Amino acid sequence: MKKRSQVFCIFIAMVLLILPLSMSDVPEICKICGEECERFCFKRRFRFCCYDYGFMKSDDESPSLQIPNV
């Protein structure tokens, strides 16, 4: 049991080290919504977390999780 928790801790540490490298574009989007939303973005790795958590009001009342076509 102890060995399993050690492996889990190492895995979490590796993930925490790798995540910031793959999220360079997320904070810019989240700064619109403020610190709290930015925190959720880092947790969720989710571009539209502001809509998801209701920190930013969208044009329509229902938050959308889809990425719009450009």
Swiss-Prot record:
Contains 3 disulfide bonds. Its main location: secreted. GO terms for cellular component: extracellular region. Residues 1-24 form the signal peptide. Keywords: Disulfide bond, Secreted, Signal, Toxin. Expressed by the venom gland. One of its GO terms (molecular function) is toxin activity. It is found in: Secreted. Belongs to the scoloptoxin-20 family. This is U-scoloptoxin(20)-Sm1a. It comes from Scolopendra morsitans (Tanzanian blue ringleg centipede). The lineage of its organism: Eukaryota, Metazoa, Ecdysozoa, Arthropoda, Myriapoda.
